[in-house]
Every structure is written in structure tokens, then in C-alpha cells.
Amino acid sequence: MPPLDDVSPEAVDVEVFGPSTRHLVVRADSSDTRKWIREAPICPLLAQHQISHVGLMRASPPFEIVRLDQSGTFMLACFEGEGMILAEGQWKRIRAGTACLQPPFVMNALKCTSGKPWKFVWVRYHETRGTRPVASSLSPVTGAFDPTALKAAVEGLHAEASGENAISALHHWSELVHQYVIRFAQPHQADGRLWRMWQQVESELGRVWALPDLAAIACVSEEHLRRLCRKELGRTPVQHLTYLRLQRARHLLAVTDDKVETIARAVGFESPFSFSNTFKKWVGRRPSDYRLSLKH
């Protein structure tokens, strides 16, 4: 895979499965005609939760997927082996017992890293820019997750959709799949101190925030704040601050005609060049290219 800086707005998605990769898929409808998915059984009830497709993957090298502008939230939970996923401009290692949640309309990529198979379950949503995505501002990007139940739900859904195809059974399986994603994406046990702190930060994204400021709001030490954020969000406090700023920037690029420099200042970047470089690293394209893509 080329370095991120080499990815141009004209680049295309990449799908490399290789001869040893195996997968099973359930899709919401027949609109997706890609070779690897077009023969999969259909469960229309998935669309009630805006789910496009779900599946299990046994990936082996040279397995590699690149999505330049992923059109929906994507959750991956590993149950054996390990692989790499590109999240927020950085490659993150995903091992067994770990999940990753990617928000919509950003660059996403995944690949194998060793000769051993990487086995995971995934759920891919299809969301429009005007709808509220599954991934929220307090959703973790990575974190501990027992994939057993989600894997079983996807296997059950596939078996039912391939066999009896009873609506009542499909309903229960699809509900379980969605609820297991929600359990990871919107944890009810989220630390109240973090919630209050990030609520205040989101209301003042244009100001300069330093780690001591954040720790003071949360009433914890700087080191404890780092540990809390790592545990709850899979990010450092500074990384999550950047995430919130870029989420707001994407919204402003979509709904306003403000100049990029104006938006950069509004979300807390003193330099438009720093804003542009950071935006490209996390989202996969520069702000001006991102805005242009919204018009197509």
C-alpha cells in the first residue's frame, strides 16, 4: 500500500483477497454487484438498521482493502490472529479480543501482517451525510471486545438466510447483530467525568486546549486522564480532541460555504496548513478535495 501522502483524490478503492482468503456474507439487498458479495444471501431486515452487509472473514496475505470514502460506519471484531487497520491516519494492530469502529466518510484500510490467517467478524452500515451515524463522538476507535456473541449472531443470520429464511428468525438475528455493535459503539458505562469534559470541549472547539486544562475539567491527574481516554476511547486526550475538531470541520465543510481558513480557526487550528495536513492524514483527502467530493 502506498504511503498516505501518495493517495490522490483520483485514486480508487482497492480489493485484494488472494487465493487463500475465505468469507461468508449476508447483504441487505441485491444492489451491490461486486464479485465477492453478489452471490451472498439477502436479509432485507438489515436495512432497518441501515446495515449494508455483515460477514466473517478468514483473511490471508496478500489480503488488502482500501476504501477512500467509506459510506457508512464499519465495525470489525477479531476472534483469531491479527491484522492492521488504518484508523485516523495511523495503522493500528487488531488482535483477538479487540474491535475497531470506523466512522463514515473517511478513508479506511485493512491488511494482513503475517503468514497466519486473520479471522474477524464485520458489520458495515450504509449512512447518508445527513443521518446520525452509529459511531458517535464518544465511541471508541479501538477497544477490548469479546466477539463470540457477534460472531454467533452473524453465523446464525447466514444460516437462516441461506436456509429456511423465516422472517421471524431473520428479525431476531439481525436485531442481535445491531445490538452487539451498539454495545461497543455506545457504551453505557462510559466514565461521567470524560463525558462532562468532552461536552465542554465540544462547545468551545475553537479555543486552545492543553492537557492540563482537560485534566482540570475532569478533576483527575493528566496521567489518569490519559489512562481513562485510552481505556474508554482507544485514543489519547490529544488524539480525541483532534478527532472532535475534524468531525466539526467535516460538518462545516458540508453545510457552509466558509473558506477553509475560516473553518480551520473555528475548530481550533491556528494554521490552515496544519489543518489541511491533519485533515488529510485522518480523513484521507484535503479539506478542499473533501468539499468537492460532496458535490458529486
Across the structure, where does each feature detected by a protein language model lie?
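Terminal helix-turn-helix DNA-binding modules in bacterial transcription factors
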Residues: 199, 212, 230-272, 276, ...
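Residue at a beta-strand N-cap/secondary-structure junction
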Residues: 84, 208, 257-258
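Short hydrophobic/aromatic patch on the recognition helix
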Residues: 97, 225, 229, 274-275, ...
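N-terminal regulatory/effector-sensing and dimerization cores
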Residues: 1, 43-139
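…primarily DNA-binding HTH/wHTH and HhH modules…
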Residues: 1-12, 36-37, 266, 276-296
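Short helix-to-turn junction characteristic of helix-turn-helix DNA-binding domains
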Residues: 78, 201-205, 253
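An amphipathic alpha-helical interaction segment
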Residues: 119-131, 137-206, 212-216, 220-224
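N-terminal low-complexity or simple alpha-helical regulatory segments
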Residues: 1-43
